[in-house]
A protein has these predicted regions:
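ATP/NTP-dependent adenylation/nucleotidyl-transfer catalytic domains that generate, transfer
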Residues: 4-232, 236, 245
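Extended, polar beta-sheet/loop recognition surfaces of beta-rich domains
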Residues: 241
Length: 245
């Protein structure tokens, strides 16, 4: 693995971030978006500088699900020198990691990968609670299996929200009730529109599936597109359907 070629290195960002917070007048006890993003951007700066130092490149870890929802810090983990996972949805990432853990033949590596799979998805930008991860992504933005379902039918077929809502009711029957499906469908559209500005300046990356959100590929969308326009036309349809379902 890469760890056999390159020396493992851990860089503590605490002091650098604290100095930065003091410089901009950020209260460290206020765990707001500045508190979170300051850490994310410090991580990226370190990675970029280490890459320069070693004549290398920063490989982005963000996947298509995160890009669709804008679940990335602008100029933080949003930025890299090559976004290798840019067209791989989060649900597929899990399967790929599990497959490699099963087949790699390296027991030590497999143990680490299984542990990663058992860990809640999180940017870990907030202090832990009782020694456990407090910031769980799917508690905040919703289940990735729902969002990946929505994304596929939006990008591959261009279906309207009402149709996607009906399809999700069938696909996830017994797993999510109608109210939950509707809640996260609205979240998906709100974030998909409002976060286009992050996708408009994505690093290069491959397209490996049937859909992608790169501005140089499948998705050409203005950053100032308003979800309000869509909501006036379509987003109320699932609410009407919920009343009659």
């Amino acid at each position: 693995g890469l760890g056999d070629v390159y020396k493992r290195q851990e860089v503590d960002i605490k002091e650098a971030v604290r100095i930065h917070f003091r410089d901009i007048g950020q209260d460290e006890s206020v765990h707001d978006v500045t508190y979170e993003n300051g850490q994310a951007r410090e991580r990226t700066q370190i990675l970029m500088d280490i890459a320069n130092k070693n004549n290398g490149m920063v490989i982005g870890t963000g996947d298509m699900s995160e890009l669709a929802l804008g679940w990335a810090t602008y100029n933080g983990d949003h930025m890299s020198m090559y976004g290798v996972n840019a067209s791989v949805p989060k649900t597929l990432v899990r399967h790929l990691v599990h497959y490699y853990a099963d087949t790699c033949g390296n027991k030590e590596l497999s143990t680490v990968l299984y542990d990663v799979l058992d860990t809640p998805v999180s940017p870990e930008l907030l202090p832990p609670e009782n020694g456990k991860i407090a910031q769980k992504t799917e508690d905040i933005v919703g289940p990735y299996e729902l969002h990946d379902f929505y994304l596929y039918y939006v990008m591959r077929f261009g279906f309207a929200p009402a149709k996607i809502y009906r399809l999700a009711q069938v696909a996830f029957e017994g797993q999510y009730d109608n109210a939950v499906i509707l809640k996260w469908l609205k979240t998906f559209y709100r974030r998909f529109f409002s976060q286009q500005f992050k996708r408009s300046c994505l690093p290069d990356g491959p397209k490996v599936g049937t859909v992608a959100v790169s501005p140089r590929g499948d998705l050409r969308m203005p950053s100032d597109a308003s979800v309000r326009i869509l909501s006036l036309i379509h987003i109320s349809e699932p609410t009407r359907l919920r009343r009659i379902s």
